Amino acid sequence: MAKRKKSDLRKINQFDTLSVHAGIKSDPLTGAVMTPIYATSTFAQDTPGKDKGYEYSRSQNPTREVLEASLAELENGHKAFAFASGVAAQTAVIDLLKPGDHVIAFDDLYGGTFRLFNEIKAKSSNIDFTFVDLNTNFSKHIQKNTKMIWVETPTNPLLKIADLKRISRIAKKHKILTVCDTTFATPINQR
């Protein structure tokens, strides 16, 4: 199946219109105006080792590609990845780190995120986490091995709002990756 081209909807200023049309192109295989749901686990191959862009839905699927393209446009990003759950996405991001790396995280996080960091990754991956109020002078917690700042805004459960511009500016100054979980805000409210 041919890869879809990125739509030109980034030129549209109205978010409501973008949210309806982002990532949507007619299906190149069938001509369907809306993307079909490909509920298959495997894709036929002409010959062994020669696929048509898809082998298994667990690695890629045309339906998921459209979802990811839509999310990237809504977030004004270059690429998006869809996961089965938020914690699966968080795990993939944290797994970018190496043993001995340090993360500064907001002190008010979703409980599942806190447990993933404090009870699983700190022990299984030897990653050091410092939980602080990122709206204060968190830069005093930056260490030589700090590789990531983890922000949640609005936070869960207290709905604290983080100053993303300030956090990002400090992180860039120290060449630290900033990750922001905006589950509560969505692209509608967090631009």
Which residues make up each language-model segment?
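Conserved PLP-enzyme active-site core in the AAT-like
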Residues: 7-11, 21, 80-191
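A broad structural signal for alpha-helix termini and local helix breaks/kinks
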Residues: 30, 75, 124-125
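Conserved N-terminal alpha-helix of the aminotransferase class I/II PLP-enzyme fold
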Residues: 42-91, 95-96, 112-120
